C-alpha cells in the first residue's frame, strides 16, 4: 500500500474546527512528574512544570542519529514521489517499523515516564522538515488546540534529525505560557505561510521567546499547552525534527484518534487505545 493511500488520508494532520467543537475538552495544564524519577532530576521536572519545556537532552550519538537520518532521507524521497511534501509525514509509526521503534525507544520512554507516570500511550509521530528556503513558518500555537483529546496531558518529544539553530529556523518556546490554559486563536492569514492553520495573535505578550537550539540526536520536551512556533528556514541547510507524542493512559481520544495509540509503558486498563502491533 502506498504512503498516500494510508497515512496521508487516514488521519488529517489538521482537523476541521467543527470536528473539534464536537469534543468537550479539558484544556488546563496538569502538573506532571513522579515522586521518584529514574532519568530526569527533580530539578528538571520542576523546570518543566514551571517553564513548559525542557532542553536540550542528549539521547543519541552522532552515529546513531545518522542511521535515523538515512531512514528519513529515504522516506522523504518516497513521500515526495507520491505527491506529498516534507511536512506530510504523520502517524508514520503505524506504517514504518523504524518510526515505531523510536516511539517505543527505551531511552525516550524513560524520559516521559518520569513526567507522565507508569502507564503511557505513544500516539503521535510527525516529521517537521523545513527544506532550505522553503518559505514556510509555523505560527505561534498550542498543540492541544488541534487535537480531539481530553484532558490535556500530552508531552511532545522533539527529536532533532538535523542540527536545529536560529539560522535554519529552530523551534521557539514562550516560557510559562502553558499556565494560561487554552488561549484564543485565529485562523492564519495566507501571507503567514503557516504550515498549520491556527495563530495565537500577539503571542509575545505572554513572555519573551526562547530558542530551542538542538544538535542532531538531542531532544526537547514540551507541554501540549506551551506556546511555540518557528520562522521560515531561509538558510541553505535542511532542518528536520521528529515529534513524538505521549499521554497518560487515562486521556481519551475522539474522531477515531484512539487508533493511533500504542502502549509504550504499563497498561491501558480501559482498553481505549488500539495498541497496534509494530508494522513490518
Language model features by range: what are they?
Residues 149-151, 203-204, 234-238:
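A generic structural micro-feature
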Residues 2-121, 215:
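N-terminal auxiliary "cap/dimerization" subdomain that precedes the catalytic jelly-roll/cupin core
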Amino acid at each position: 500500500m502506498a504512503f498516500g493511500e494510508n497515512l496521508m488520508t487516514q488521519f488529517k494532520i489538521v482537523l476541521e474546527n467543527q470536528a473539534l467543537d464536537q469534543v468537550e475538552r479539558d484544556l488546563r495544564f496538569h502538573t506532571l512528574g513522579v515522586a521518584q524519577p529514574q532519568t530526569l532530576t527533580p530539578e528538571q521536572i520542576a523546570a518543566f512544570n514551571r517553564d513548559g519545556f525542557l532542553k536540550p537532552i542528549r539521547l543519541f550519538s552522532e552515529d546513531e542519529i545518522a542511521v535515523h537520518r538515512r531512514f528519513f532521507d529515504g522516506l522523504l524521497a518516497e513521500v515526495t514521489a507520491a505527491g506529498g511534501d516534507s511536512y506530510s509525514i504523520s502517524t508514520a509509526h503505524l506504517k514504518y517499523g523504524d518510526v515505531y521503534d523510536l516511539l517505543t525507544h527505551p531511552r525516550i520512554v524513560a524520559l516521559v515516564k518520569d513526567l507522565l507516570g507508569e502507564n503511557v500511550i505513544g500516539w503521535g509521530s510527525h516529521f517537521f522538515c523545513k527544506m532550505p528556503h522553503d518559505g514556510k513558518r509555523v505560527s505561534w500555537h498550542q498543540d492541544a488546540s488541534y487535537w480531539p483529546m481530553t484532558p490535556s496531558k500530552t508531552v511532545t518529544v522533539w527529536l532533532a534529525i538535523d542540527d536545529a539553530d536560529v539560522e535554519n529556523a529552530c523551534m521557539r518556546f514562550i516560557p510559562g505560557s502553558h499556565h494560561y490554559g487554552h488561549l484564543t486563536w485565529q485562523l492564519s492569514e495566507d501571507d503567514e505561510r503557516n504550515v498549520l492553520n491556527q495563530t495565537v495573535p500577539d503571542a509575545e505578550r505572554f513572555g519573551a521567546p526562547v530558542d530551542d537550539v538542538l544538535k542532531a540526536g538531542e531532544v526537547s520536551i514540551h507541554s501540549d499547552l506551551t506556546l511555540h512556533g518557528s520562522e521560515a528556514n531561509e538558510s541553505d541547510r535542511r532542518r528536520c525534527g521528529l515529534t513524538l507524542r505521549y499521554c497518560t493512559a487515562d486521556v481519551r481520544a475522539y474522531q477515531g484518534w484512539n487508533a493511533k495509540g500504542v502502549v509504550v509503558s504499563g497498561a491501558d486498563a480501559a482498553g481505549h487505545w488500539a495498541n497496534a502491533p509494530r508494522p513490518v
